[in-house]
Regions:
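Generic alpha-helical propensity signal that fires on short helical segments
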Residues: 178, 185-187, 304-305, 426, ...
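Polar low-complexity, Ser/Thr/Gly/Ala/Asp/Asn-rich disordered segments used for subunit assembly
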Residues: 1-31, 38-41, 46-121, 126-132, ...
């Protein structure tokens, strides 16, 4: 057989196959990390969880870690709706303790004396703030628990419990500044229940609170976020106000949101005010005076992290949201309500038979802070992937800049779809770009993107292969929280 030479097809047509480089996946700002100072059933630095039952296996079903994790999965929607994962990081920070005042053993004679008292008074100093309550009617009491209930009815910012034959008054704050004292009332027209006939407070014992020790939450978060990304931070640790403020300050520069609870309602005007005045908007506080305040803030964080930013009209507000499984705070009053509003602390109250969150402005509302975090991470990924996903290069030309700005514009369009951004009117002076185009873009779309022409870029920046700075103006759609209605009627 004669073999005839054939010229290979590749001599004429040479085909090479290449794939575009893989880009970064989007950061999931709805993922939540619990930093647990309870014993863990594993030695890893952290574990990921898709169900609360696995948390019970590792920490025990009676642990606070499990109760907080379980609370994350309860609301509908919750952080999983937003695609979030749960990570739990063990760390060795100890709990701060609360100050308390414990009476001596009270006898039957003390209870008998209370039974004849219709208008008793009590002066108590809690964390340095003195309150005097009167009108304490003990005529129906039979036990120390009954006596405690009468005092509880005055809604003092203190936990009152019975331990054998003693009544214990425990501060709802913790740390070295946490304290409780029972005072003597000097007014002759008031019947002082601190006297030896009743509580015999002069022989009671006041114990000051102590600060947390060991690894701080701030240090634990800084180390953990290098291992896996999460957008929300919770902790089982109990801390004092100084440590809480230090944690908030350290977490503020990080790309995450710190959710914390305040059991003391008086803390609204103290640490709540400090956090707001320091500009620490990434710390979101919920004042809730019940013992399960840590579970309440976990439920709150889950609802706040439930936005699926890939969806349509999915953006939310925490205002008037119900926290599944959490009762409204019966310790609230008008003073605390107004204090929470002015100091940017959220509360959970009863209105018309339902329990809802009242969300307040701490350098932005909770949804503002979460939306800003998502927006930042989405823009980072969009810009990186545009530069990354080419087998050649993005030229330093107007064409290259148009492509880069288009990548950022896709995030802005997504923000319109999910309801974070909306068309509106820009209030104030035009900050950059062409004033007419700026105004038109904000009114028609809700965002405006601008960069100076390549020809105007400083040569030093061009030599460093930097793009001209891209400036983006966004009009957040906000949320309606209040409404005034005026009705004019003619007869």
């Amino acid at each position: 057989m004669t073999v005839t030479y054939e010229v290979p097809l590749s001599y004429t047509i040479n085909v090479s196959l290449s794939a575009l480089p893989q880009g970064l996946a989007e950061f999931n700002t709805n993922s939540i990390a619990i930093f647990s100072n309870e014993p863990a059933g594993f030695s890893d630095s952290y574990r990921a969880y898709l169900t609360p039952s696995s948390v019970a296996t590792d920490f025990g079903s009676n642990s606070l870690t499990y109760k907080m994790a379980n609370a994350l999965f309860k609301p509908v929607p919750n952080f999983r709706t937003g695609g979030g994962n749960l990570y739990i990081f063990p760390f060795d920070g100890t709990n701060a303790t609360a100050g308390n005042f414990t009476t001596i053993d009270l006898k039957e004679s003390n209870i008998t004396a209370f039974q004849s008292l219709e208008n008793g008074s009590l002066s108590i100093t809690i964390d340095g703030k003195t309150s005097v309550v009167s009108g304490l009617n003990f005529t129906s009491v039979k036990t120390l628990e009954d006596i405690a209930n009468v005092i509880r009815s005055k809604n003092l910012d203190v936990n009152i419990s019975v331990d054998s034959n003693k009544i214990v008054f425990t501060s709802r704050s913790a740390g070295a500044s946490s304290s409780v004292e029972i005072n003597t009332i000097s007014k002759a027209d008031l019947i002082d229940i601190s006297s030896s006939t009743y509580l015999d407070a002069s022989n009671g014992i006041a114990t000051a609170g102590t600060d947390a020790k060991g690894t701080t939450l701030a240090d634990a978060v800084a180390q953990a976020i290098q291992q896996v990304y999460f957008g929300g931070v919770l902790t089982t640790q109990v801390v004092g106000d100084d440590t809480r403020l230090a944690n908030a300050t350290a977490i503020q520069p990080l790309d995450c949101v710190y959710y914390d609870s305040l059991q003391s309602l008086n803390a609204i005007s103290k640490i709540g005010a400090d956090i707001k005045s320091a500009g620490l908007g990434k710390t979101r506080t919920l004042a809730y005076s019940k013992d399960n305040h840590k579970v309440a803030i976990a439920t709150y964080a889950s609802v706040a992290s439930s936005v699926n930013y890939s969806g349509s009209n999915t953006a939310n507000t925490m205002n008037l949201k119900t926290l599944t499984g959490i009762l409204g705070d019966s310790g609230l009053n008008d003073t605390y309500l107004l204090s929470a509003q002015s100091n940017g602390v959220d509360i959970y109250a009863n209105t018309g038979g339902i329990s809802v969150v009242y969300s307040n402005d701490n350098n932005g509302y909770t949804d503002d802070i979460n939306n800003q975090l998502w927006l930042k991470k989405a823009l980072e990924v969009a810009g990186f992937n545009y530069l990354r996903q080419t087998n050649t290069k993005i030229p330093q030309t107007e064409e290259g800049m148009t492509g880069l700005k288009n990548a950022y514009a896709q995030v802005c369009e997504q923000a319109i779809r999910n309801g974070v951004v909306g068309a509106g009117t820009w209030n104030g002076s035009i900050p950059f770009g062409d004033a007419e185009k700026f105004t038109e873009a904000i009114e028609q779309k809700g965002y405006y993107i601008y960069s100076i022409p390549i020809a105007q870029q400083p040569q030093t920046e061009r030599e460093q292969r930097k793009a001209p700075v891209v400036q983006i103006a966004l009009k957040f759609s906000g949320a309606i929280h209040f409404s005034d209605v005026i009705v004019t009627i003619q007869r």
